[in-house]
Amino acid sequence: MASSVMSSAAVATSTNAAQASMVAPFTGLKSAASFPVSRKQNLDITSIASNGGRVQCMQVWPPYGKKKYETLSYLPDLTDEQLLKEIEYLLNKGWVPCLEFETEHGFVYREYHASPRYYDGRYWTMWKLPMFGCTDATQVLGELQEAKKAYPNAWIRIIGFDNVRQVQCISFIAYKPPGY
């Protein structure tokens, strides 16, 4: 109760002290009319927005006829050398490699309900067991070749599992069936 009672002189003093240390308010930009104009008016709309000439090489992902799967799915299929580099990366991080496959849908879909559930394409079948203790990328690539032979019309992905934090750290499509 005592702290809420102040004299009006104390309020005025503290307000003036706060105003003395304040910065002047922003008054806006200067008028462009005061600067001399030495260039002609360009009505070409392509010159308005530019990122240094790189606009011509950018492409837009086609929304029809191409499914988006997971990480790196927008790229062309990875070669064996590129797969080995990705696998070596996850092994160097100390993650456990594991293969998973899906025979019907290699992408998220809604069949039984509109909200995410078990049967929406997120959960794939594990190929054998996680490769605990694996230190050679060619072993993982060999398992991938076996999975391709067993299920040639399936999507196969490689995941890297961190068994300390118990999370999946990397996942990418290693094989797509013909026609996808």
Curated annotation (Swiss-Prot):
Tell me where on the tree of life, at the top rank, the source sits. Eukaryota
**CDD domains from the UniProt entry:** RuBisCO_small
Which keywords are on file for this protein? Answer: Calvin cycle, Carbon dioxide fixation, Chloroplast, Photorespiration, Photosynthesis, Plastid, Transit peptide
Gene Ontology biological process: photorespiration; reductive pentose-phosphate cycle
- Primary site of residence: plastid
Q: Which InterPro entries does the record associate with it?
A: RuBisCO_ssu (IPR024681), RuBisCO_ssu_dom (IPR000894), RuBisCO_ssu_N (IPR024680), RuBisCO_ssu_sf (IPR036385)
Q: Establish whether keyword Chloroplast is in the entry.
A: yes
- Where in or outside the cell? Plastid, Chloroplast
Q: Which PANTHER family match?
A: RIBULOSE BISPHOSPHATE CARBOXYLASE SMALL CHAIN 1, CHLOROPLASTIC, RIBULOSE BISPHOSPHATE CARBOXYLASE SMALL SUBUNIT 1A, CHLOROPLASTIC-RELATED
This chain's function reads: RuBisCO catalyzes two reactions: the carboxylation of D-ribulose 1,5-bisphosphate, the primary event in carbon dioxide fixation, as well as the oxidative fragmentation of the pentose substrate. Both reactions occur simultaneously and in competition at the same active site. Although the small subunit is not catalytic it is essential for maximal activity.
Extra notes? The basic functional RuBisCO is composed of a large chain homodimer in a 'head-to-tail' conformation. In form I RuBisCO this homodimer is arranged in a barrel-like tetramer with the small subunits forming a tetrameric 'cap' on each end of the 'barrel'.
How does this chain assemble? Heterohexadecamer of 8 large and 8 small subunits.
Family per UniProt? Belongs to the RuBisCO small chain family.
Q: Indicate what this protein is called per its UniProt record.
A: Ribulose bisphosphate carboxylase small subunit, chloroplastic 2
> Which species does the entry assign this protein to?
Petunia hybrida
